[in-house]
């Protein structure tokens, strides 16, 4: 989460007014407003790689894929975020012009300043979204994608993808993506190479 604004509490209307005139995006939680920090090149490249795979995969499926410029209403008047990537296939979201409400997939690229938030409070809030089936936490320091998938029993199953030949496959979205494709041109080393550098004292 970014830095809280100096004003201690905002109403939802004040938050929307701030977003309409600000060049910086803000997230909102229970009256507090947080400015979002700028993304690194690796962060931005990883998000773009997901978009490049998702757009053709979703063609003809009546789904929308959006980047971090589009707001998500996690809970109206209480919690608004800007996921790095999200996909909604809900008909109600097809009519929205300012925000999405019912995503099936959310991708967050982890940053040092937001990782605890993305793993903790944010994920706990995202779990309340009735449409959400897949939540991806993507490292930007090594090849690691953590995939949380809602099972038919209502539990969230966790899968860690860290090997070069590991692949993310979400058939209902037509998505099949290897780790190499996730990290293409991002300048991020595979986990084994990172471990090797640490073991040899290389930098």
What annotation goes with each model-predicted range?
Residues 1-203:
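Gly/Pro/Ser/Thr-rich low-complexity, intrinsically disordered segments predominantly at protein N-termini
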């Amino acid at each position: 989460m970014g830095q809280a604004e100096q004003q201690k509490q905002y109403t939802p209307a004040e938050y929307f007014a701030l977003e309409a005139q600000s060049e910086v995006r803000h997230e909102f939680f229970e009256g507090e407003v947080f400015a979002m920090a700028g993304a690194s090149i690796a962060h931005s490249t990883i998000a773009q790689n997901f978009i490049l795979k998702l757009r053709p995969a979703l063609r003809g499926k009546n789904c929308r894929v959006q980047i971090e410029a589009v707001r998500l209403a996690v809970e109206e008047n209480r919690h608004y975020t800007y996921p790095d990537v999200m996909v909604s296939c809900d008909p109600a979201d097809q009519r929205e012009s300012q925000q999405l409400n019912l995503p099936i997939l959310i991708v967050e690229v982890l940053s040092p300043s937001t990782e605890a938030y993305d793993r903790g409070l944010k994920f706990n809030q995202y779990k309340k979204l009735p449409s959400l089936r897949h939540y991806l936490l993507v490292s930007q320091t090594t090849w690691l994608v953590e995939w949380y998938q809602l099972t038919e029993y209502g539990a969230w199953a966790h899968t860690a993808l860290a090997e070069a030949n590991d692949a993310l496959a979400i058939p209902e979205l037509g998505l099949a993506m290897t780790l190499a494709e996730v990290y293409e041109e991002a300048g991020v080393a595979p986990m084994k190479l990172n471990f090797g550098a640490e073991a040899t004292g290389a930098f």
